[in-house]
Amino acid sequence: VLSAVPAVGLAAYVYSTDITSREPLSLLVATFLLGVLTANFAAVLNSVLRPYFGVLGVVGTVLFFFVVVGPVEESVKLLAVRLYAYTDDRFDAVLDGTVYGAMAGLGFAVIENALYITRELPATELDVGLGLIGAGGGITAIRALAGPGHVIYSAIAGYYLGLAKFNPGRRGPIVVEGVLIAAFGHPTSNATGGIGSGVIGDVNRRSGLARFM
């Protein structure tokens, strides 16, 4: 839950800055849930393709983020908006795309954080008491760095989707431009999260050593 707080706060901020009409709760909730569903599809696709890049070492990891993770995750989050909210008459302004994009990103981030923490928290830590708190806290902090990125870049792509809705003559190029911008920024966010992961992991190891001493 704590790992999602920054993403929730950012999504709430995007919602509050909508200077047009307030978006209906039904569309916001539906978009959030679709963001959760599309996250599962992205997770499967990422898992299938990752081994092909793993053989290339660090270069493969970078390529994987830019060629697969960014485009796939930003596309499915935009799909979460396109499937329902976009088709509703209440999606009646360009900035609505930003709000719904942020909600799709929030849904994606929440389920991704939950899956990541469940997978990464070692089963052996369950018997260690304070060790569990330390490990869980470290992972939570790492995921807290990643969550806002999903909201930000999904909101950017959503803005372009809003532009596309009201510029039917250039709809395709506008949507592609938005996805490309978000897909390029996303791996940069992942790299930042990776640096944070290393720092937090090092702090946790040092703390454990200090307790032992």
What kind of feature is each model-predicted range?
Residues 1-213:
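Hydrophobic alpha-helical segments at protein termini of multi-pass membrane proteins
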